[in-house]
């Protein structure tokens, strides 16, 4: 019988952190408490992975890098959402996203650079 070269030789207890879409990832559960620093690149408007990681490791330091998310982005994103919300009574979620961003990144040891 041939040996299956794709079979796993050990078991890893994986956990999904973040959303079920692009913002979430599978990682070994055992490394969460061992991690001191989390570097995140390409944050966008979904920091659910970082938020979930921080919830499981309160001492974690997080540095996020994304050149597309800046003051101008939030200004335009929020103003446009407010305008369309007033006009059409929708896009309220975009406004809430801004406030969630401010709340998460105002925590100690959490930076968006």
Placement of each model-derived feature along the sequence:
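SAM cofactor-binding core of SAM-dependent methyltransferases
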Residues: 14-113
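Rossmann-like AdoMet
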Residues: 1-21
């Amino acid at each position: 019988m041939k040996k299956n070269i794709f079979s796993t030789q050990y078991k890893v207890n994986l956990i999904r952190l973040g959303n079920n879409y692009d913002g979430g990832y599978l990682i070994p559960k055992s490394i969460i408490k061992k991690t001191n620093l989390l570097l995140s690149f390409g944050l966008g408007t979904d920091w659910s992975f970082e938020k979930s990681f921080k919830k499981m490791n309160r001492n974690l330091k997080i540095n996020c890098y994304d050149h597309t998310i800046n003051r101008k982005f939030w200004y335009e994103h929020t103003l446009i959402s407010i305008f369309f919300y007033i006009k059409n009574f929708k896009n309220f979620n975009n406004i809430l996203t801004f406030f969630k961003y401010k709340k998460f990144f105002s925590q100690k040891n959490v930076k968006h650079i």
